[in-house]
A protein has these predicted regions:
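Glycoside hydrolase catalytic-domain context in secreted enzymes
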Residues: 1-356, 362-380, 396-757
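Short beta-strand elements
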Residues: 381-397
Length: 757
């Protein structure tokens, strides 16, 4: 992020003074489904130790021991990585370490997780708090976006005493960066996010120049939490979130709304390298539909490295809401030696930057000039000499309106004003059953139905009859489904008991019909097996860090490797990736998601899914859709315009479905415009299957608050962690659902199972 005077990478023999509890308190990833049971997590001090053993650098052992012992004591008291207060500043040790040539490295770490949102100061706090959030508030009374008072004192003391200072950010999401960007006494900064179990080693390699940074920001880093338009209403109520920022999310807001660009510290797409690169457009053409570009990238510096090419489009400002600039394509080079060149070729439809017209229910390219540019970030653009002009509006796709809001009271315009919207009451609840209380829906273990544990490597056993005939092409799937009794069909639409190492339950499990019990597993940072099982797996970097590579080829390889562990441990479906948009820095689960930009998130996640499914296991993309707040997530209503839904919050899912066809999609807990996502036919059937041609099955998130029969009728095929067959049968007797509906759900499940090894 910052490298004044080329302070990085360290020269051989550099002396390093580690500061901040973060140098020992390394946060490998976030909490919840993204937490992995692994053999060991390496922190920066351990990374420096390895480098010292190799004769690369030396480091101050007294400081390292001070922070190591401090962190060890608090871990022993049950505190989690990233959720311990900053250590008192070691004045005497710092004075001894302040020798000529010494470089101080300050590490700032943050932790967040599933089920709670990041603390944000008393002015904005949610009234709903769990124990972890209460603990976080004690450590960060001003919110964890900003430095704590203790961290500010640490920075103040270090920058006073040391002439060379580097900052390392071990965080899972957006934080304040103005404090070092504006500080001339901090010469360098690395955003390392959360790098999994090997993160501390990787940080040391980056500091030493063993590896050359090549990432780009996937989010906008603003001066203040208040600069993000999503902040004001984030905790206005725990029952809903009004997406009044509309399509202006992240860089779309800061580059479009007047005067907001001044609040950006580091823009989307920004990133530095230890080397330099030159770019030259060799060819640019527009054939009336597609834009073609050939870009030559040359390493003009002294270090080996990779480079990202970002292509942006500025559309004409017509009648419809539009962002000033939109990412349209991207690519990454292989590692280039000094003076080495490579050509990257791009071809993408202009329709990629179309706008959704709610009045006419169509994707449209408005007439006018479309400016194409290469960018070193979304705010550092070099125009390409290419005439892209439409003389008339062009309809890209005609659709039907879906998910139209009735409670959105206002929405942001491109000039910074707000359009006032008509508000209507929600329609009456269509459920014919008395809904169960939330206390009856939480954490119920599936009843034991069908067969127990079966080794999935023994194909001759787990598909010995019935369904095996379908798999072998000896029986049509439809006739097989017709042979299954109603109780078994209904039972298959709910989660099944754990077997083997599983802790997130299975699906299928009808021994009578030769249908195996296929296990699922969390999570987005690797296979998550409970610690008491005695099995460890790889803790991969968090999704935001993976996305920061802007490297589709790498993401596909990560998917392939992760799937090998899924398969090795007898799981059939990996509950990953998670691709919700980084609408607000406050979302506690942002580390698990990719970006504020749907194209970047969609393309990279699609690559990961292709890698996963090339290994014979299934990927389950989640959370569909608008899961951008963890507080009261099972009841919160995401109130959002159809244009914002289609252009921002559904777009990455659309890309994923069309480019990688995941085996499964997981619906989100929340409501969307008054209807649970899990009960929303317009979302799960009309859009997902009708418009996007999804071929897999849809599962709920675990123990949501939706009604099972309404989920089935909407197009959700599997309720996890368990189903409610008695309630489904009651709805059948009332005529609210039919067995033909349920057969359709089972068909989706069985078709997906046939795709798995």
């Amino acid at each position: 992020m910052k490298n004044e005077g080329n302070i990085l990478p360290f020269a051989r023999g550099t002396c390093v003074a580690p500061f901040g509890k973060g140098c020992a308190d390394y946060v490998a990833g976030g909490g919840g489904s993204g937490e992995v049971t692994t053999d060991r997590v390496y922190n920066l001090i351990q990374g420096l130790s390895f480098a010292e053993l190799q004769g690369e650098i030396t480091y101050d052992h007294a400081l390292a021991d001070y922070y190591t012992e401090y962190v060890k004591r608090l871990y022993a008291k049950g505190m989690k990585p990233g959720l311990i207060p900053e250590a008192p500043f070691p004045s005497e040790l710092a004075a001894k370490a302040n020798t000529p040539g010494m470089v101080a490295v300050i590490v700032i770490s943050r932790f967040s997780g599933e089920g709670w949102d990041r603390c944000c100061g008393s002015k904005l706090h949610s009234v709903l708090k769990n124990d972890i959030l209460k603990q976080e508030e004690k450590i960060f009374p001003h919110g964890d976006f900003s430095l704590s008072d203790e961290e500010r004192e640490l920075v103040s003391q270090v920058t006073k005493q040391f002439s060379k200072v580097i900052v390392v950010l071990n965080v899972g999401g957006m934080v304040d960066t103005a404090w070092f960007s504006d500080n001339p006494h901090v010469q360098g900064a690395l955003l390392v996010l959360q790098g999994g179990s090997m993160g501390g080693i990787a940080i040391a390699d980056l500091l030493l120049g063993e590896e050359n940074p090549s990432g780009r920001l996937v989010d906008t880093y603003a001066r203040s939490l208040d600069d993000y338009p999503s902040t004001e209403g984030f905790h206005a109520t725990s029952n809903s979130v009004a997406y009044t920022d509309d399509i202006f999310v992240g860089y779309r807001y800061f580059t479009t709304i007047p005067a907001q660009n001044k609040n950006v510290v580091y823009p989307f797409g920004y990133g530095l390298s230890y080397t330099t690169f030159g770019k030259k457009v060799l060819n640019a053409a527009f054939d009336g539909a597609d834009i073609s570009l050939t870009v030559q990238v040359t390493n003009t510096g002294k270090f080996r490295g990779k480079n990202v090419v970002e292509v942006y489009v500025t559309p004409p400002q017509g009648i419809l809401r539009k962002a000033h600039v939109v990412l349209a394509a991207f690519g990454k080079t292989q590692t280039l030696a000094p003076d080495e060149s490579v050509e990257l070729t791009f071809r993408f439809p202009l329709a990629r930057v179309a706008s959704y017209d709610e009045k006419r229910a169509e994707w449209i390219l408005e007439k006018g000039d479309y400016e194409i540019a290469l960018g070193e970030s979304c705010m550092d653009l070099q125009p390409i000499k290419l005439r892209v002009q439409l003389d008339d509006d062009a309809v890209v796709e005609q659709l039907k309106n879906h998910l139209v809001p009735s409670q959105l009271f206002q929405r942001l315009n491109a000039d910074g004003t707000y359009e006032q919207c008509a508000v209507h009451a929600y329609e009456k609840d269509s459920c014919v059953l008395h809904r169960q209380s939330s206390s009856k829906l939480e954490g119920i273990v599936p009843e034991v139905v069908g067969q127990g544990y079966v080794d999935r490597t023994m194909e001759s056993t787990w598909l010995s009859e019935g369904f095996q005939e379908v798999a072998n092409g000896k029986q049509e799937l439809e006739s097989f489904i017709d042979s299954i009794d109603d109780d078994a069909l209904i039972g298959m639409c709910g989660g099944q008991p754990n077997t083997g190492l599983a802790n997130t339950y299975g699906f299928g499990n009808q021994k009578k019909y030769g249908i195996p019990n296929m296990m699922t597993c969390d999570g987005p940072a690797g296979v998550r097996i409970l610690p008491d099982c005695g099995v460890t797996t790889t803790w991969f970097p968090c999704a935001t860090l993976l996305a920061s590579t802007w490297n589709e080829e790498l993401l596909q390889e990560v998917g392939r490797v992760a799937a090998s562990e899924v398969k090795e441990n007898n799981f059939a479906l990996w509950l990953a990736p998670a691709v919700n948009i980084h609408r607000s820095p406050l979302c506690g689960r942002n580390f698990e998601y990719y970006s504020e930009d749907p194209l970047l998130a969609g393309k990279l996640a699609a690559s990961l899914i292709r890698g996963v499914q090339s290994n014979g296991v299934g990927a389950c993309v989640k959370h569909f859709a608008c899961n951008n707040k963890e507080t009261n997530r099972k009841e919160s209503d995401s109130i959002v315009s159809e244009q914002a839904l289609r252009e921002i919050y559904l777009r990455q899912f659309e890309i994923i479905i069309k480019e990688s066809q995941p085996v499964a999609v997981m619906s989100s807990y929340n409501k969307i415009n008054g209807i649970y996502a899990a009960e929303n036919k317009e979302l799960l059937t009309d859009i997902l299957r009708g418009e996007w041609k999804f071929e897999g099955f849809v599962t709920s998130d675990w123990w949501n608050h939706a009604e099972h029969y309404l989920e089935l009728k909407a197009g959700e095929d599997l309720k996890m962690g368990c189903g409610y067959p008695k309630r489904v049968k009651k709805a059948l007797r009332k005529g609210a659902i039919t067995m033909e509906d349920i057969k359709g759900n089972v068909r989706h499940l069985l078709q997906a199972m046939l795709r798995l090894d």
